[in-house]
Amino acid sequence: MLLDPLADAMSTIKNAENVGKPECIIKPASKLIAMTLKVMADLGYIGEFEFIDDGKSGMFKVKLLGRINRCGVIKPRFAIKVAELEKWERRFLPARNFGVLILSTSQGVMPHTDARARGIGGHLLAYVY
């Protein structure tokens, strides 16, 4: 039974990276997964990804670059303010300026660095480094 599609997607990416596969398939597809993959692609952690319609919920085909050491979701999805970002960075990232927290904000899904620059908080979704 699939309870958290985003957690399943991050687990699939992490396992495929650990084995050294050049690409992976993420099922089922959702808008939240698409926005999270876009943030990861913009930051250079993954290559291109494309949506494949299979007549059901769809799937994503993701090109892997071998740049992810670890990735995962943050549960429960804590609501944080801008001032609390550093506390959560220390908890989930291994070093300062290494890796990224992915947040869902009122202005869309973005990395924590963009949220800090814009001065907005949001809900923690995932971490990647």
Swiss-Prot record:
GO terms for cellular component: ribonucleoprotein complex; ribosome. GO terms for molecular function: rRNA binding; structural constituent of ribosome. Keywords: Ribonucleoprotein, Ribosomal protein, RNA-binding, rRNA-binding. It comes from the Archaea. It holds the Pfam family Ribosomal_S8. GO terms for biological process: translation. PANTHER family: 40S RIBOSOMAL PROTEIN S15A (PTHR11758). Part of the 30S ribosomal subunit. One of the primary rRNA binding proteins, it binds directly to 16S rRNA central domain where it helps coordinate assembly of the platform of the 30S subunit. HAMAP family: Ribosomal_uS8_A. Belongs to the universal ribosomal protein uS8 family. This is Small ribosomal subunit protein uS8.
